Amino acid sequence: MIRPQSYLNVADNTGARKVMCIRVLGGIQGQTANIGDVIIAVVKDALPNTGVKKSDIVRAVVVRTRKGIRRENGMFIRFEDNAAVVINKEGNPRGTRIFGPVARELRDRNFTKIVSLAPEVL
């Protein structure tokens, strides 16, 4: 569950390392985001000479949460960290690589490009 002021790791190679959620687009009553929800975030830590800089405002999709999600078959998926992937307005990732596993629920939310770039889909 990601709320405004929550920090997330960035799971792609855009150059951002940490982002802070400042707005949840959609989600549960517009207050909390789970896996597959789009958020607006501000870059808090970034590598130099890359596509995004510190204090840039970006859109991101949540790909991992410590809270986890329950699937219809009863399985419960939980990750070690909260992570997001920076996207553009069309919903495509701005980076060319995704680091770490992502949840299968992203495919249901039409983020197929992120799922295809991910090294592991759980």
From Swiss-Prot:
SMART domains for the chain: Ribosomal_L14 (SM01374)
UniProt cross-references to Pfam families, sorted A to Z: Ribosomal_L14
Compartments where located: Plastid, Chloroplast
Xref: PROSITE patterns: RIBOSOMAL_L14 (PS00049)
GO biological process, one term: translation
Domain of life from the UniProt record: Eukaryota
GO cellular component terms, semicolon-separated: chloroplast; cytosolic large ribosomal subunit
Record's keyword terms, sorted: Chloroplast, Plastid, Ribonucleoprotein, Ribosomal protein, RNA-binding, rRNA-binding
Main location: plastid
Gene3D superfamilies in alphabetical order: Ribosomal protein L14
Similarity comment: Belongs to the universal ribosomal protein uL14 family.
Quaternary state and interactors: Part of the 50S ribosomal subunit.
Function description: Binds to 23S rRNA.
Stated name of the protein: Large ribosomal subunit protein uL14c
Gene name for this UniProt entry: rpl14
